[in-house]
Structures are given as structure tokens and as C-alpha cells.
Amino acid sequence: MIRGILSTIEIALLSALILATRCANYQDVFVAGNIYFVDADCYARMTRAQMCDAQPGLIVRHHAFENFPQGTTPHTTAPLDYLILSLSLLLKPFTAHALDLAGAFVSPLLALLGGWFLWWWSRRMKFQYRWVMLILYAISPILVHGTELGRPDHQSLSMLLVTIAICAEWSRWEATGAATARWAVVSGTAWGLAIWNSAYEALILFVLVIVLLLVLGDKEAPHSGAATAKSRRAGWVCFVLIIAIALLLERRIPSLSILHSSAIFKNWSRTIGELAHVSPANPIWLRWCGYFVLLTPFLIWMSMSGHSRTRQQRTPWLALVLVVPTYGFTIWQARWGYFFVLIFALALPALLAPIKSPAAVWIAFVLSIFPILRDWDERIWPNETQLAARVELRNESAQLRELALSLQSRDVHPFLAPWWLSPSIAYWSGQPGVAGSSHESLNGIEDSARFFLSEDLQEPRKILQNHRVAWVFAYDSERVAQNSAAVLNQELPLHPLCRVLDRTPSQAPPFLIFSAQTAAFKLYRIAVER
């Protein structure tokens, strides 16, 4: 009885902490009765969910709403689309904005499921310092960012599935008898779904794990290797079946951004935060993981040297093979930070196990999370400059939504806008855009950048004609010009078109008719040539 009450209290506290951190940005998501998402990719995802809602059973294999008129073959897949749609069906009896609300809450709910799973799994594994892992999972800023309110992105589902897959592999090592096969099924299913959801990080992690299993061997089949042991056959069947279903439904192999080598892609990727490099000396590591990240090499060495030939020795190898490569990948691309911190948190209880003093561990842990707490202090109580920037962003989002809604029509009236604004305009207006926020939209991104930097009339006119544009959105000319110049890797011209459209609408080219404006945006209609 007492044990059940304590478990309930633990789950309640963990759930409250996870939801409180994930929903800390609610003022930026719920604005004046409307729901806004945190970045451009989220609006692209919600447009996919919108299409599935309008035509249940649809597998979205082509994006006509970006890179118009060619469109794109996206790297995004169906699992998250239908997860959002399923959640919206549950919410429909309670709200008129079920799809938007489902998109806003899907990632925090996935984080909550991940927290519950880790609570159950770590308890089953009898980790002495399990709450170190659970607290870091709940409060790490980058894990929160990947699963926060208003961020319906594939990363949140990937993080949940990768968590389950790695924990299942870990448990399979420790299991005996029939439990070994059961954990293999869980692992194979989770890896299959994770790769279906996103064939990038999950696929690379899966390959690393399989290599690790082949190298270490298996206690049941020491001569065949763990990856091919009999106990894994059911898991492999589940994995292959899910991948086969994914290929059958998606009917395409997603393109990987790392395979792109064009100059435009390299230029554009430098403007994307999640594709940026993270220096090993960057203090953001401490904000993500706390000071314990500095002790990781020592903890791995101490764990391995303390009982080098025992069953527990497999755990440090898991940390070594997954923590170290994901750290290197994060230095290369910041988007790997989600998985580095996730795996770091999973490894911490085992890495701390050789330390026999719980008091020493908890004192060190509390001191180590000071950088994380400082980050939360800045988020919850921002200074005047940060608060003003947030308020400005909310106001701009509301203004852009107002203009976009005015474009709604049964007819197709394509628009041209800065690439990072295009997905939200497409979602609200239902009209296709020239640009987009994915690497598949590079042609449209390049043309929109050339349009805004043009100084003569012929090039922008030709771009509008080629893309059959009916509307043009003008925004802050300084930001648009700088971003466009970065994408094209060229100097800023003296009189770019974006500056004219933003600051002096009366001097706009004759084929651009000034139609509407807000404090931050201006809307131009394309004159029909006779």
C-alpha cells in the first residue's frame, strides 16, 4: 500500500516537472485565442496533418504547398501526421480548434510518455541513482526544446522511440530466458518505427548499436554475435516487417540533407540553427547537461576499471559507443544534441554506480545543474530586451496570420515570401508558396532570395512569372536582405528590392500593386499583364 502511494507520488511529481518545463512557453503559443507554433518546420508538419484530416488515409508523398509549382518530395513521413490527427479526433468534442491544439500538445505528451517509460524501466533495472537521469530528462533545456509546447516536429517522436529502443537493448543484455526475446521484440519494433519516422539520426544510432552488439558478442550465442543471436530473431522479424510496411506506404526513400553538396545548400545550412556547428568550448554544453558532462570521461574510465569483467561492464560500453559518437555528431550539427543529452542522461545512473556515497552523488548533482537552472531563470524571468523581443515576435505572428487569412480562396493564388515565413503563410492561407523551410525547397529558396536582392526589374518579373506568383509578402528589409545575401553568398546590393517593398511602397515596380499592410508586413498583388 505504502509502496503504491510512493510510486503514485513519484509519477505525479515527475509528470508535473516534465509538463511544467515543456509548457513554459505557453504565452508564445497561445496568443489572443489563437495557436502559434514555434518554427517554420512545425507549420509544414501541420499542413501535412491538415491534408490528412481533409482526406483520411492519405499518405503525403508530395508537397505542393512549397517550392511551387514543382513542389517537393519530402523527407517527412506519415507516423507523426497520423499521431497528430488521432489526438485531434480525441479533442474534437471539446474544442473547435482540435487540429491546432493536437499539434501544440503532441510533443509534450510524447515527452510525458518517455518520462513514464524511463521511470518504469529505471525502477525495473534497480538503478541506485535513477532520479539523476529522470531529473535531467525533465529539465535539460535541449530535451525540453525538442518536445516543447507548439513544436509538432518529428524529433519528439524520434526521441521517444530511440529511448525505448536503447533501453530495450540494455534490458535484453540483463535479461534471461523468455524475457530476452520479449525485449528483442520491443527493441526491433522501436527501431523500426524510429527509422520510419526519420531515417537519419535513428538509422545511424541503430547501425552503431548493431556494430556494438556484433563486437561484444552475446552471452547466449558467443560465436555468432549478439546481433544475430536466436533470441533476436523475433525482434528482427518485427523490424523488417515495419520497414517493409514503411516502404510500401511511403513509396519513396527520403533524401538525406548530408548528401547535398550544392553551394546553395551549404550557404543556406549556415543560416539554420540546428545545422550549425557546436564548439567543444561552447558553454551551451553546460546549459544542456550541467557540470557532469565535464566528468564523463573520468566516470566512464572509473566504471570500466572498477569491475572490468562482470556483467555490469556492458553498460559502460553502451555509454562509450553511443555517448562519444553523438557528442562528435553534435559538434558537427547541433540537431544531434537532442540524442547526445538523451543518451548521456540514460548512461548517468550506470556511470555513477561505482560511487558508493549517495550523499556525495546528490550534492555533486545539485551543484552540477546550476548552469541548467540559470538557463531556466533567464527563460522564466527574461530581461527587458528579451521580453520585448518575445512580445514583438508574438505581435508579428498575429499580424502575419491576419494577412495570410485574407488570401484564403478556392482558387490557387501562389505567394512569394521570405522562406522562413512561407510555411506559416501556406498553413493559414491554404495557398502554395515559392519557398519553404526544408532542403527539398532549395530552388524556391534561391529564387525568393534573388527576388528580394534584385536591383533591376527584369529578374524579379521573370521569377514571378516562372512561379506563377499572385502575391508577395514584404518583411523587415534588413533581415531579409542579410539572409538572402547569406543564402546566395553575395554582397548586399545598395538598393535591393526588399528595401523598396518594405520602406517605400509607392516606389515599388509597376507590376507590384500595394494591397495591404500591418506594422511589420506589407502585401503586394501581382498586376495582370494584358
Range-by-range predicted roles:
Residues 24-124, 132-136, 140-161:
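Active-site lumenal/periplasmic loops and adjacent helix-entry segments of GT-C-fold
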Residues 240-241, 346, 352-380:
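Signature aromatic-anchored transmembrane alpha helix within multi-pass, membrane-resident enzymes
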Residues 158, 181-185, 189-306:
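Transmembrane catalytic cores of multi-pass membrane glycosyltransferases
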Residues 1-3, 125, 170-185, 214-230, ...:
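Membrane-interface junctions at the ends of membrane-embedded or membrane-associated helices
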Residues 1-29, 131, 232-238, 358-364:
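Start-transfer (signal-anchor) and selected internal transmembrane alpha helices
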Residues 18-21, 106-121, 129-173, 180-213, ...:
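Membrane-embedded helix bundles of polyisoprenyl
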Residues 113, 370-530:
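Extracytoplasmic
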